[in-house]
Amino acid sequence: MIRFEHVSKAYLGGRQALQGVTFHMQPGEMAFLTGHSGAGKSTLLKLICGIERPSAGKIWFSGHDITRLKNREVPFLRRQIGMIFQDHHLLMDRTVYDNVAIPLIIAGASGDDIRRRVSAALDKVGLLDKAKNFPIQLSGGEQQRVGIARAVVNKPAVLLADEPTGNLDDALSEGILRLFEEFNRVGVTVLMATHDINLISRRSYRMLTLSDGHLHGGVGHE
Protein backbone atom coordinates (compact mmCIF):
# COMPACT_ATOMS: atom_id res chain seq x y z
CA MET A 1 0.00 0.00 0.00
CA ILE A 2 2.76 2.43 1.03
CA ARG A 3 6.40 1.83 0.13
CA PHE A 4 9.44 4.02 0.74
CA GLU A 5 12.65 3.11 -1.08
CA HIS A 6 15.78 4.89 0.22
CA VAL A 7 13.88 8.15 0.70
CA SER A 8 15.72 11.27 1.87
CA LYS A 9 14.41 14.77 2.44
CA ALA A 10 16.62 17.84 2.83
CA TYR A 11 15.38 21.37 3.39
CA LEU A 12 16.92 24.66 2.35
CA GLY A 13 19.96 25.34 4.48
CA GLY A 14 20.99 21.69 4.39
CA ARG A 15 18.90 20.31 7.27
CA GLN A 16 18.38 16.61 6.60
CA ALA A 17 14.90 15.62 7.82
CA LEU A 18 14.99 12.03 6.49
CA GLN A 19 17.93 9.92 5.37
CA GLY A 20 17.64 6.71 3.36
CA VAL A 21 14.27 5.65 4.78
CA THR A 22 12.96 2.30 3.52
CA PHE A 23 9.78 0.55 4.70
CA HIS A 24 6.59 -1.03 3.38
CA MET A 25 3.04 -1.07 4.77
CA GLN A 26 0.58 -3.68 3.59
CA PRO A 27 -3.03 -2.74 2.72
CA GLY A 28 -5.14 -2.87 5.88
CA GLU A 29 -2.15 -2.69 8.22
CA MET A 30 -1.96 -0.46 11.30
CA ALA A 31 1.41 0.81 12.52
CA PHE A 32 2.89 3.44 14.81
CA LEU A 33 5.56 5.95 13.83
CA THR A 34 7.58 7.02 16.87
CA GLY A 35 10.55 9.24 17.62
CA HIS A 36 11.56 12.38 19.47
CA SER A 37 10.38 15.84 18.43
CA GLY A 38 12.18 16.77 15.23
CA ALA A 39 12.98 13.16 14.31
CA GLY A 40 11.17 13.45 10.96
CA LYS A 41 7.74 11.98 11.72
CA SER A 42 5.73 14.88 10.31
CA THR A 43 7.96 15.08 7.24
CA LEU A 44 7.40 11.39 6.49
CA LEU A 45 3.62 11.76 6.69
CA LYS A 46 3.69 14.88 4.50
CA LEU A 47 5.66 12.97 1.87
CA ILE A 48 2.97 10.28 1.70
CA CYS A 49 0.17 12.76 1.00
CA GLY A 50 2.14 14.98 -1.35
CA ILE A 51 2.50 18.04 0.90
CA GLU A 52 6.28 17.58 0.65
CA ARG A 53 8.41 16.02 -2.10
CA PRO A 54 11.48 13.81 -1.47
CA SER A 55 15.00 14.93 -2.29
CA ALA A 56 16.00 11.37 -3.18
CA GLY A 57 14.48 7.89 -3.36
CA LYS A 58 11.05 6.64 -4.42
CA ILE A 59 7.64 6.59 -2.76
CA TRP A 60 4.91 4.21 -3.92
CA PHE A 61 1.23 4.49 -2.99
CA SER A 62 -1.22 1.76 -3.99
CA GLY A 63 1.13 0.60 -6.74
CA HIS A 64 1.76 4.07 -8.17
CA ASP A 65 5.03 5.99 -8.05
CA ILE A 66 4.11 9.30 -6.38
CA THR A 67 7.67 10.59 -6.10
CA ARG A 68 7.27 13.20 -8.82
CA LEU A 69 3.55 13.83 -8.97
CA LYS A 70 2.44 16.75 -11.09
CA ASN A 71 0.60 19.42 -9.11
CA ARG A 72 -2.66 18.63 -10.90
CA GLU A 73 -2.37 14.97 -9.78
CA VAL A 74 -1.96 15.69 -6.07
CA PRO A 75 -5.72 16.14 -5.35
CA PHE A 76 -6.42 12.63 -6.70
CA LEU A 77 -3.84 11.23 -4.26
CA ARG A 78 -5.20 13.16 -1.30
CA ARG A 79 -8.76 11.93 -1.89
CA GLN A 80 -7.48 8.46 -0.97
CA ILE A 81 -5.91 9.71 2.27
CA GLY A 82 -7.42 11.04 5.48
CA MET A 83 -5.00 13.31 7.35
CA ILE A 84 -5.39 14.06 11.06
CA PHE A 85 -3.24 16.65 12.84
CA GLN A 86 -2.51 17.43 16.49
CA ASP A 87 -3.83 20.90 15.69
CA HIS A 88 -7.07 19.80 14.05
CA HIS A 89 -7.25 22.87 11.74
CA LEU A 90 -11.00 23.30 12.23
CA LEU A 91 -12.75 26.41 10.90
CA MET A 92 -14.01 28.11 14.05
CA ASP A 93 -16.65 30.17 12.23
CA ARG A 94 -18.26 27.05 10.71
CA THR A 95 -20.41 24.46 12.43
CA VAL A 96 -19.22 20.94 13.13
CA TYR A 97 -21.36 19.73 10.22
CA ASP A 98 -19.84 22.26 7.83
CA ASN A 99 -16.30 21.37 8.89
CA VAL A 100 -16.85 17.68 8.23
CA ALA A 101 -18.57 18.39 4.91
CA ILE A 102 -15.64 20.34 3.42
CA PRO A 103 -13.85 17.39 1.72
CA LEU A 104 -17.11 16.26 0.11
CA ILE A 105 -17.92 19.76 -1.14
CA ILE A 106 -14.45 20.04 -2.67
CA ALA A 107 -14.93 16.64 -4.33
CA GLY A 108 -18.24 17.78 -5.85
CA ALA A 109 -20.52 15.38 -3.96
CA SER A 110 -24.28 15.87 -4.20
CA GLY A 111 -26.23 17.46 -1.36
CA ASP A 112 -27.91 14.17 -0.45
CA ASP A 113 -24.58 12.34 -0.43
CA ILE A 114 -23.02 15.03 1.76
CA ARG A 115 -25.85 14.85 4.30
CA ARG A 116 -25.74 11.07 4.45
CA ARG A 117 -21.97 10.75 4.75
CA VAL A 118 -21.45 13.63 7.19
CA SER A 119 -24.14 12.19 9.47
CA ALA A 120 -22.53 8.73 9.26
CA ALA A 121 -19.06 10.12 10.05
CA LEU A 122 -20.29 12.15 13.02
CA ASP A 123 -22.25 9.18 14.32
CA LYS A 124 -19.11 7.04 14.10
CA VAL A 125 -17.14 9.43 16.33
CA GLY A 126 -20.09 9.96 18.70
CA LEU A 127 -20.81 13.59 17.79
CA LEU A 128 -24.00 13.44 15.73
CA ASP A 129 -25.78 15.48 18.41
CA LYS A 130 -23.13 18.22 18.09
CA ALA A 131 -23.57 18.77 14.33
CA LYS A 132 -24.96 22.30 14.73
CA ASN A 133 -22.41 23.37 17.34
CA PHE A 134 -19.36 25.47 16.62
CA PRO A 135 -15.91 24.04 17.45
CA ILE A 136 -15.37 26.63 20.21
CA GLN A 137 -18.30 25.04 22.07
CA LEU A 138 -16.58 21.63 22.17
CA SER A 139 -13.92 20.15 24.42
CA GLY A 140 -10.44 19.42 23.09
CA GLY A 141 -11.23 15.74 22.72
CA GLU A 142 -14.46 16.50 20.86
CA GLN A 143 -12.65 18.89 18.51
CA GLN A 144 -10.14 16.17 17.70
CA ARG A 145 -12.99 13.76 16.95
CA VAL A 146 -14.46 16.32 14.54
CA GLY A 147 -11.07 16.32 12.79
CA ILE A 148 -11.22 12.54 12.59
CA ALA A 149 -14.77 12.61 11.17
CA ARG A 150 -13.61 15.08 8.51
CA ALA A 151 -10.66 12.81 7.67
CA VAL A 152 -12.82 9.70 7.18
CA VAL A 153 -15.91 11.24 5.54
CA ASN A 154 -14.44 10.57 2.07
CA LYS A 155 -13.93 6.89 2.97
CA PRO A 156 -10.15 7.02 2.42
CA ALA A 157 -8.03 3.92 1.94
CA VAL A 158 -5.38 5.33 4.29
CA LEU A 159 -5.48 7.32 7.53
CA LEU A 160 -2.38 9.31 8.51
CA ALA A 161 -2.41 10.78 12.02
CA ASP A 162 0.26 13.22 13.20
CA GLU A 163 0.38 13.28 17.03
CA PRO A 164 -3.45 13.18 17.24
CA THR A 165 -3.41 12.68 21.03
CA GLY A 166 -0.64 15.16 21.84
CA ASN A 167 -2.93 17.62 23.66
CA LEU A 168 -5.25 15.06 25.28
CA ASP A 169 -5.26 13.26 28.62
CA ASP A 170 -4.79 9.50 28.93
CA ALA A 171 -8.49 8.58 28.82
CA LEU A 172 -9.23 10.74 25.77
CA SER A 173 -6.08 9.47 24.04
CA GLU A 174 -7.19 5.88 24.58
CA GLY A 175 -10.57 6.70 23.06
CA ILE A 176 -8.98 8.24 19.96
CA LEU A 177 -6.74 5.21 19.51
CA ARG A 178 -9.75 2.88 19.76
CA LEU A 179 -11.42 4.87 16.98
CA PHE A 180 -8.41 4.29 14.73
CA GLU A 181 -8.55 0.59 15.55
CA GLU A 182 -12.22 0.49 14.54
CA PHE A 183 -11.39 2.03 11.16
CA ASN A 184 -8.51 -0.39 10.75
CA ARG A 185 -10.79 -3.37 11.42
CA VAL A 186 -12.86 -2.46 8.35
CA GLY A 187 -9.78 -2.40 6.13
CA VAL A 188 -8.38 1.14 6.42
CA THR A 189 -4.58 1.34 6.48
CA VAL A 190 -3.55 3.42 9.53
CA LEU A 191 -0.19 5.06 10.26
CA MET A 192 -0.14 7.07 13.48
CA ALA A 193 2.80 9.24 14.53
CA THR A 194 3.19 9.62 18.28
CA HIS A 195 5.80 10.07 20.99
CA ASP A 196 3.45 8.61 23.64
CA ILE A 197 5.10 5.23 24.17
CA ASN A 198 2.89 4.47 27.19
CA LEU A 199 -0.21 4.72 25.00
CA ILE A 200 1.01 2.41 22.25
CA SER A 201 3.06 -0.07 24.29
CA ARG A 202 -0.14 -1.94 25.21
CA ARG A 203 -0.71 -2.73 21.52
CA SER A 204 1.07 -5.27 19.31
CA TYR A 205 1.10 -3.26 16.09
CA ARG A 206 4.34 -2.70 14.22
CA MET A 207 6.43 0.22 15.44
CA LEU A 208 8.56 2.31 13.09
CA THR A 209 11.05 4.46 15.00
CA LEU A 210 12.73 7.56 13.57
CA SER A 211 15.88 9.02 15.09
CA ASP A 212 17.54 12.04 13.48
CA GLY A 213 15.99 11.15 10.13
CA HIS A 214 16.99 7.47 10.17
CA LEU A 215 14.39 4.70 10.46
CA HIS A 216 14.94 1.91 12.98
CA GLY A 217 12.86 -1.06 14.06
CA GLY A 218 9.75 -1.89 12.11
CA VAL A 219 9.00 -5.19 13.84
CA GLY A 220 5.99 -5.95 16.01
CA HIS A 221 6.26 -5.47 19.76
CA GLU A 222 4.58 -7.13 22.67
From Swiss-Prot:
Record membrane topology: Peripheral membrane protein
Highest taxon in the source lineage: Bacteria
Pfam families tied to this protein: ABC_tran
Annotated protein name in UniProt: Cell division ATP-binding protein FtsE
Subcellular location: Cell inner membrane
Role summary: Part of the ABC transporter FtsEX involved in cellular division. Important for assembly or stability of the septal ring.
InterPro entries, per database record: AAA+_ATPase, ABC_transporter-like_ATP-bd, ABC_transporter-like_CS, ABC_transpr_LolD-like, Cell_div_FtsE, P-loop_NTPase
Domain ABC transporter: 2-222
Subunit comment: Homodimer. Forms a membrane-associated complex with FtsX. Interacts with FtsZ, independently of FtsX, FtsA or ZipA.
Keywords: ATP-binding, Cell cycle, Cell division, Cell inner membrane, Cell membrane, Membrane, Nucleotide-binding
GO CC term (a single one): extrinsic component of membrane
Keyword Calcium: no
Similarity remark: Belongs to the ABC transporter superfamily.
Organism: Escherichia coli (strain K12)
Coiled-coil residues: none
Residues involved in ATP binding: G35, H36, S37, G38, A39, G40, K41, S42
Key word Phosphoprotein present: no
GO molecular function: ATP binding; ATP hydrolysis activity; transmembrane transporter activity
Main location (coarse class): membrane
Disulfide bonds: none
GO biological process, any: division septum assembly
Result of knocking out the encoding gene: Inactivation results in a filamented cellular morphology, but not in a temperature-sensitive phenotype.
